[in-house]
Amino acid sequence: TTIIKMLSCLTKPTSGDILVGGYSTTKEPEQVKRLIGVSPQETAVAPNLSVKENLELICGIHSFSKGKTEEKIRELSGQFALDTVLKRKAGKLSGGWQRRVSIAMALISEPQILFLDEPTLGLDVIARHELWETIRSLKGKITIILTTHYMEEAEALSDRIGIMKSGKLLAVGTVEELNALAGTNDFETAFVSIVKEDTVV
């Protein structure tokens, strides 16, 4: 979560700098913000607004015309199957639906990079798998950086995985590469081995 906040210019690093798309998060935050969309761990939906009003709010922040706003809401409603809940208060939706709306809101500005911070935290198994399908539908269209504590989720969704401990990036690679590094065929076992070793590789 702290890394996501630094990458999205919400928190400044205590030292050093981060480049996103070639822009500095500390010196050029406005340029970075134009490149990214963020669905935070605490969903960004306004609970007292309808789903449609939430989407309209973000379109307004980006100064979309009425026509572009309507077009964008139609597009996202189809992409995220929101048609049946557009008029419902966001706060009355399940956690899975709220997360889906939050991701749709993050995509309104058509970012190049989407940050998903613990997207399925607190969801039941069915809602989690449904959201996985939503995230899979975005692959190939946009760069997604996702944080998770669920090994199964990382394995199911990621092309490349970075393993972190106490703010230190220990290893980066595909599931197969990380398994080979740890000498196992099981990713959860590989994760435990790499974290216990606590050595950057």
Language-model-detected regions and their locations in the chain:
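Helical segment within the ABC ATPase nucleotide-binding domain
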Residues: 128-140
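Conserved ABC ATPase "signature" region
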Residues: 56, 60, 67-85
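Catalytic Walker B motif of ABC-type/P-loop ATPase nucleotide-binding domains
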Residues: 114-117
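Helix-to-loop junction immediately C-terminal to a conserved catalytic motif
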Residues: 8
